[in-house]
Structure formats: C-alpha cells, structure tokens
Amino acid sequence: MKAGIFLVGTELLNGATIDTNSIYIAEELNKYGIEIEFKMTVRDVMSEITKALTYAKKNVDLVILTGGLGPTDDDITKEAMAKFLKKKLVVDEKEKKELLKKYKAYKNPNKTNFKEVEKPEGAVSFKNDVGMAPAVYIDGMVAFPGFPNELKNMFPKFLKYYVKENNLKSQIYIKDIITYGIGESVLETTVKDLFTEGDIFYEFLVKDYGTLIRLQTKIENKKNVAKIVKKLYNRISEFIIGEDDDRIENTIYECLNLGEKPLTISTAESCTGGMVASKLIEVPGISENFIESIVSYSNEAKIKRLKVKKETLEKYGAVSEEVAREMLAGLKTDIGISTTGIAGPGGGTKDKPVGLVYIGIKVKNEVKVFKRELKGDRNKIRQRAMMHALYNLLKILSKKVR
C-alpha cells in the first residue's frame, strides 16, 4: 500500500513555517508497511490543490493533506477536496456542537468559525481535542490541521479507523533506544558489531533530547530486537536514558517518587536562564516535587538570592566550580541543580572559552560539580547545558535507587 503527503500552505514555501508533520506521518504509516510514495508542498490555491489530488489519486492508495482547515479565506483544503470529489460542503452538526462548547469558554463564534466544521458530504470526522478543526476522511483522502500538536492528537484516531477499514495489521516493529552523553560517531563505532541478528535495519538519529539507536524489523523478528537491546544495555548502559517515548524529565520524575516520601527539587540557573526548570515542569504531577527556580543571572543576584560569597566571585569568577557549588548551598530542597557558564557569542577568554559550563548537582548531602566545554551557538550551548544537567542528575539518581 502506498501513500502520498501534501503539505498545504504558502507559508511552507516561503520559509515562514518549517514542516515536521511529514516525519511523524511517515513513521506512523511505516509501522503498517504503508510506503510514502511522495511528499509535496502546495500553495493555498484551489487549482493547485485539485491538480495535486488528481495526480495523487492515480498513484497512491491514501492521500494525506495537512494545513488549510482553519476559518480564514485562504483555508481551502476541504473545499478543494469537495470540488475534486464533486460533493457539497456540509456542516458536521456533531462537530458544530463541540465547536460551540470550545468557543463558549472565551467568546461566541462568528459565521466564519463554522467553516472549521465543514466537510465534504459523506466524510468521517475525527475529534480535535486540542484545537478547533476536526480531521476529515473520505474516499482515500484525509485532511488534518497544520498544527503539529493537533495532527498528533487526531492521527492515531484516524489510523485506527483506517487500519480497521482496510484490515491492515502491523508489519513493522520499531524500537528506539535513547542515549545521551556520547557522540553519534563514537556511539556507532562502539555498538555496530552488535547488530548481527538477521533482517534488522538500524540507524542513528540525533534529536534535541539525545541520540536514538533505532532498530526496525518485520514484526515476526521482534525477539531478535530484544536480544540486541539486551546487548546494548550490557555495553552502554551508562549512556542510555530511555526507550521509545521516554523522555529524561519523565524518568527523573519517576526517580523522585520511588521512595515512601517524594523528593523535592529546585534549580539555581545562570547561563540556562530557567531552561532546566522549564523542562522539569513539563511533567504533569511534578508540583509535588518541584519547589522553586532561581534565575540568578547577575553576580548581585547570586549573592543576594543564593548567598554566594562575594569573595568567591572575586577570586574565581562567576563561571567556576566554586560558584556552582555555592549556588547549590542556597537551595534548601532534597535535590538541587545549578548552572553557570558562558553561552556566547561574546564573553569568552583563553582560560574560560565560550561554551564552558559548570553544572552542580546536590542530592541530599552529596554534591558534585561537572565541567563541560560545549559547542554550538548561544541557543545550542544553553540547550546542551540543560540536557547535561538533567543527564548528570539522572545518572546520580539511578545509582541511588538501584
């Protein structure tokens, strides 16, 4: 079975928006052996969308469109589908009721908003739990809003429906092992000899949250993947921070709540400017653990808020092991994280170059400070400092709960 993806939106062609939807779609369809035949970007122009649909229906079994489902004049994807199929656009009365509930929270909808719940006559709608416009499916064509969070909310619902309708079964098994603290090339050199089990494809994918070792095979070879995963843990366990949909912040949260009493945590951040705290509080329920974040960017704030000694700052400088250690002393929770560094582009010296970061970790009475020299632009250095802080905390917590 083959599928084609159309990304609808002039903003995708002029660089105003970056596509991430097609990656997600391809990965999900791949699990059922559905091949992506093509991916195309189409402007918000009726003739171009209908022309694209004509091409697609001759070449693939499933046509997926994202974008153009909103209430404005240039949102014409469903209108183009209806025109191509020679069907009327009708209001989905069930979805209209849902839309009214959503708008009631802050304003009443006007007539243009009801455009979001229109569909080609006979189409099936899929409820949008995080936005306004539902996805619609008819005659081998499905349209989703362009917002990634809305697509990810509805795509599993559609896929479940489509799989059942076409009597498909999962053909591909995918296992992701998430690593951090080891470079992609070193990782490959370290583990590539382990991939000897038959008919298993492997690749290394660099993400913001780590480097993935992706193992892919036919569903009947699932046991062979399990054997490789076991070997990976035996060889590189110190760098493994999770599997599949695991994320480091969720794993840390689990570690904080393994005992009879939840552990509390706070952060004192300079160069990361609250990024460590922000990542942690993405986890639902962490309010029982997370107490505060102090962004002490200036020396004055470090002295006043965290009781860092003026003498320490004068002798060693703000970017130093000693200051990272004293920043932790100002945190009164079970666990503390401190960051201080030079994110650039300016401010570096020969002794303290741009990218130099000190990360302090306090767990109960044990304190460790890690020195890192990170590469990249300002945002990359800050992102990597945040991830290194969480990675080092996880490694310490993992040892304590074993």
Swiss-Prot record:
Database matches in InterPro entries: CinA, CinA-like_C, CinA_C, Competence-induced_CinA, MoaB/Mog-like_dom_sf, MoaB/Mog_dom
SUPFAM superfamilies: CinA-like, Molybdenum cofactor biosynthesis proteins
Any one Pfam family match given in the protein's UniProt record, by short name: CinA
N-terminal signal peptide: none
PANTHER family on file: NICOTINAMIDE-NUCLEOTIDE AMIDOHYDROLASE PNCC, NMN AMIDOHYDROLASE-LIKE PROTEIN YFAY
HAMAP family listed in its UniProt record: CinA_B (MF_00226_B)
Record-stated family: Belongs to the CinA family.
This protein's name: CinA-like protein
